[in-house]
Curated annotation (Swiss-Prot):
It holds the Pfam family Ni_insertion. GO terms for molecular function: lyase activity; nickel cation binding. The keyword RNA-binding does not apply. It comes from the Archaea. It comes from Methanosarcina mazei (strain ATCC BAA-159 / DSM 3647 / Goe1 / Go1 / JCM 11833 / OCM 88) (Methanosarcina frisia). This is Putative nickel insertion protein. HAMAP family: LarC. Keywords: Nickel. Belongs to the LarC family.
Length: 396
């Protein structure tokens, strides 16, 4: 089990992501073959040194005469390339992300009529297909991205002078919920292609997840900056047989809120995607009775859950403790059949294992067992025991 972490302290572009993944150990021959069979280009790889850091520089050599393609033309090219299914699915989604962002910015709802400019050229096609193939080649269980340095200032493009980040890039960041920051470099450091590739593959994190670095790679950018213009990537193995997970903890104190409101809030938060909810009694200043509401959430769900807490309780604010790394067992739901009093019933059981497949725990789904208990007349505790016993025989 391993994770890939991109650390874009100098931004990211398609060729930088491709070079980084190749430097981490992706199959160079396979990636080169896929790129050159999918687009009218050739690919060269060389080692360079950027301000003291050795990196891979990927050069996509394109025909002298290039023309802008429409989004449907790009889709047809990708589908005609006979790529591996995972690579094709990733490439199509990356181009869809760019198309939807361009459409939103330009007010063009019909993607069939959408013309790509820079991102519709052969080098962008090669970057997307190559990066998708290279990242899949690394066989990572998860991919993360720390806050992206987008640069600052303005850029010149087909639509004239635009601010950094470019509107389409900013829209991709918004939709992908990636963390980003401005930098003191008066230059575009994050391209739309780079943003779309990261939005497809990566979950946002503030810091590196806990673990051991097993490989480090650098992909070189074209421009010469004051610092090293490279994209850093790190392959990390968790220091455990459990599965790494990134969560945020939301917490607030609430007084003058009835039990009925708290009970409803509990259910609402879970239905909105909270991983877990705890409501604990507390005593506040001047001896006022109150409750502490604590929620475990995915980072991308925190804002909507915090708003729900404020709206439902009247709280003036919610504390967010970000990017906490927890280790969890790998869990999946299986359905099994059990025999009770001569009748056969079906129930779900939750199976927990570590990353090496060792069984850690089996628990029967309570709601299923409750229904079986009502039908069979067998106490629910006995139904759960029998279900877990049967599951242990099947899955141990």
């Amino acid at each position: 089990m391993k994770s890939l972490v991109f650390n874009p302290f100098s931004g990211a572009a398609g060729d930088m992501i491709l070079g980084c993944a190749l430097d981490l150990g992706a199959d160079r021959g396979e990636v080169k073959e896929l790129i050159e069979s999918s687009a009218p280009v050739s690919m060269d790889i060389r080692e360079v040194v950027k301000k003291g850091i050795k990196a891979l520089d990927v050069r996509i050599n394109v025909p002298e005469k290039e023309y802008f393609r429409t989004y449907p033309e790009i889709v047809d090219l990708v589908k005609a390339s006979k790529l591996p299914s995972k690579v094709e699915a990733s490439a199509l989604d990356i181009f869809l992300k760019m198309a939807e962002a361009e459409a939103a910015v330009h007010g063009q709802p019909d993607l069939e009529k959408l013309h790509f400019h820079e991102v519709g050229q052969s080098d962008a096609l090669a970057d997307v297909i190559g990066s998708s193939a290279a990242i899949h080649s690394l066989n990572c269980d998860s991919v993360y991205c720390t806050p992206i340095n987008v640069g600052s200032g303005t850029i010149e493009c087909a639509h004239g002078t635009l601010p950094v980040p470019a509107p389409a890039t900013l829209e991709i960041l918004r939709r992908g919920k990636l963390y980003f920051r401005g930098g003191n470099v008066n230059k575009e450091l994050l391209t739309p292609t780079g943003a779309a590739i990261l939005a497809h593959f990566a979950k946002p994190v503030d810091n590196f997840p806990q673990g051991r670095a097993v490989a480090i790679g650098y992909g070189a950018g074209d421009a010469e900056l004051q610092g090293p213009n490279v994209l850093q990537g790190v392959l990390i193995e968790p220091d455990s047989h459990l599965v790494p997970d990134i969560i945020e903890v939301l917490e607030t104190n609430a007084d003058d809120v009835s039990g009925e409101v708290l009970g409803n809030l509990f259910e609402e938060l879970l239905s909105m995607g909270a991983r877990d909810v705890a409501i604990m009694p507390a005593t506040m200043k001047k001896g006022r009775p109150a409750h502490i509401i604590k929620v475990i959430a995915k980072p991308e769900d925190s804002a909507k859950l915090a708003r729900k807490i404020i709206v439902e309780t009247g709280s003036l604010g919610v504390r967010v403790m970000p990017a906490r790394h927890r280790l969890t067992a790998s869990r999946n739901i299986e359905r099994i059949k059990i025999d009770l009093e001569g009748q056969e019933f079906e129930t779900a059981v939750k199976i927990a294992r570590d990353s090496e497949g060792v069984l850690l725990n089996i628990s029967a789904e309570f709601e299923d067992c409750k229904k079986i208990a009502k039908t069979s007349g067998v106490p629910v505790r006995e139904v759960m025991r029998r279900a877990e016993e049967a599951a242990r025989k099947l899955f141990s």
